[in-house]
Amino acid sequence: ERCVHLLGNAEARHRPARVVFASRLSYLFAIDPDLTRLHLLPHFRWERDETEALAVWQGFGWQPHLDPLLWNEIKTDFLSCFQEGRINQLGKTASSLAQALAAAGLHFGLDDLPRQATQGAISRMDPETRAGMLHWIVGALTRGNDRATDPDTVWAERVKPWIQKFWPRDPQIRSSTEARPWVEMALATN
């Protein structure tokens, strides 16, 4: 009951509690999806309250963890984090959310992300955030020792299709900051 009280009302004095709950969103959703849908997820909606949404997305961004069911619930508001203005307000949290965006694309499938919204999100990221996202992808290529995680297999089946579908082609957003992870990707594969 106390948990519901802290989550369910919109009192600003309870916002720090909601931020902490947001940092454990995946865990809470796995334990009780109905309670989470009813009392926590509404605070992630940008159209409801920008200040509240910014706070809980920053909490979620401390250690973002996604599973396919949760992703389906939050992806629209998640992509809205990368709109002009909001991405700057998120500060360093934008980097961890960018990595979570890459993870969602690589692990949940290309069809779960709208192409234009995803390309727009990546385009609006600063070069350091895009480079961090690419470094995360390099890590995804080089983790593991079995066939399922062979870098060439991961490249061919997940990373290359993701890049082809979502990475913006605009030469205006390219930067030297992003060059190193592209090279590391090339070196990790044959």
Where are these regions (language model features)?
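Non-catalytic all-alpha helical scaffold/repeat segments
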Residues: 1-190
